[in-house]
């Protein structure tokens, strides 16, 4: 069983990405392959779920362990297969989904592909009350997003906000901000270039 893969994102298609490591390219199915577009040609860590059938072995990829956990929980629901589960979490924002499950909002759930009224009720029946850890983690993460630029210099704050606008996640930025802050009196452009160098190491 694979937990994650770390390698170069070589190819991005509408259905999957290819990550190369050890001179082997791994085809990984993801809910939104184009969310990896900014990482194309660079090293990325992708969390994995290996799905085995008699006629096929597939790797499904996720950008966080929370997404993967929710995917596995959805697979435990009768009537939900890997492609349906992946489509449900493709937005990358699991909080509204879990909120809908907890509040028994089957109308919200039927907005997802291949989820009818019966399947929506089954999701609620099987998963309500079992996803608290995931939603708590995501809420804490989102609350931290609001504080990411607190206490930074104007130039560094501008650089961080620009990097967010380019699609870099709060998780990625929080790893490099302490190192960026050690460099005093840089322009916003210089901070951006520094961040890009740090994130590709």
From Swiss-Prot:
Region (Domain II): 64-142
Gene Ontology biological process: DNA recombination; DNA repair
InterPro entries: DNA_helicase_Holl-junc_RuvA_I, Hlx-hairpin-Hlx_DNA-bd_motif, NA-bd_OB-fold, RuvA, RuvA_2-like, RuvA_C, RuvA_C_sf
Gene: ruvA
Domain note: Has three domains with a flexible linker between the domains II and III and assumes an 'L' shape. Domain III is highly mobile and contacts RuvB.
Descriptive protein name: Holliday junction branch migration complex subunit RuvA
Region (Flexible linker): 143-153
Intracellular or extracellular location(s): Cytoplasm
UniProt keyword annotation of Coiled coil present: no
């Amino acid at each position: 069983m694979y937990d994650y893969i770390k390698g170069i994102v070589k190819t991005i298609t509408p259905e999957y990405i290819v990550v190369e490591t050890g001179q082997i390219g791994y085809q990984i199915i993801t809910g939104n392959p184009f969310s990896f577009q900014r990482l194309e040609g660079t090293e990325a860590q992708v969390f994995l779920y290996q799905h085995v059938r008699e006629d096929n072995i597939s790797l499904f990829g996720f950008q966080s362990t929370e997404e993967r956990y929710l995917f596995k929980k959805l697979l435990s629901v009768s009537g939900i297969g890997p492609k349906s589960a992946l489509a449900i979490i493709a937005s990358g924002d699991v909080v509204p989904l879990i909120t809908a499950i907890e509040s028994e909002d089957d109308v919200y759930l039927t907005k997802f592909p291949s989820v009818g009224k019966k399947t929506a009720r089954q999701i609620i029946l099987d998963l309500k009350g079992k996803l608290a850890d995931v939603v708590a983690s995501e809420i804490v993460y989102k609350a931290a997003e609001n504080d990411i630029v607190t206490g930074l210099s104007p130039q560094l704050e501008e650089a961080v906000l620009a990097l967010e606008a380019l699609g870099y996640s709060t998780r990625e930025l929080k790893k490099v901000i302490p190192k960026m802050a050690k460099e005093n009196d840089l322009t916003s452009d210089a901070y951006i270039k520094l961040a890009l160098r740090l994130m590709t190491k």
